[in-house]
């Protein structure tokens, strides 16, 4: 299981609702990206969780991970960085991306858990 807690929601982080994208970063997010990011504390990390078929839980929302880019687990491990797309999986998957279904943009709040588990 991978577990994090949402600590801060950048003032522009939810501006990507129409594109159905959430950007997560650890507390060390670069200042120019912090305002666009969901800042979270990664409490538990398991690289094996980053695979198609795993569950992604954000607060009360439950998703199935459909595809994972080759750098997503590494980015999460080192930077707390994760980009989640609630869209159809494209032909070319971005290296740091996770694609989740259903394709519904979640409402997020400070203090909520984010879980990834097989």
Where are these regions (language model features)?
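N-terminal disorder-to-order initiation segments that are Gly/Lys/Arg-biased
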Residues: 1-37, 112-113, 118
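Helix-rich interaction surfaces within compact, conserved domain-sized segments
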Residues: 24-25, 88-118
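Short, structured beta-strand/loop micro-motifs enriched in basic residues and often containing a Trp
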Residues: 33-45, 91-100
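Short, conserved secondary-structure segments in the cores of folded domains
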Residues: 46, 52, 72, 102-104
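Short, well-ordered loop/turn sites that connect or cap secondary structure elements
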Residues: 48-51, 56-57, 108
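Conserved "cap/hinge" positions at secondary-structure junctions
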Residues: 59-60, 118
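Short, conserved beta-turn/loop elements at beta-strand boundaries and strand-helix junctions
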Residues: 61-62, 68-74
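Short, solvent-exposed secondary-structure boundary/capping segments
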Residues: 72-83
């Amino acid at each position: 299981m991978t577990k994090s807690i949402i600590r801060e929601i950048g003032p522009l982080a939810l501006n990507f609702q129409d594109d159905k994208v959430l950007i997560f970063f650890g507390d060390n997010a670069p200042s120019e990206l912090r305002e666009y990011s969901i800042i979270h504390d990664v409490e538990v990390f398991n690289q094996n969780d980053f695979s198609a078929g795993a569950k992604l839980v954000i607060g009360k929302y439950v998703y199935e991970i459909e595809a994972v880019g080759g750098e997503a687990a590494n980015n999460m491990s080192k930077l707390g960085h994760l980009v989640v797309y609630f869209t159809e999986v494209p032909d070319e998957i971005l290296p740091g991306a996770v694609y989740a279904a259903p394709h519904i943009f979640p409402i997020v709040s400070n203090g909520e858990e984010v879980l990834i588990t097989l």
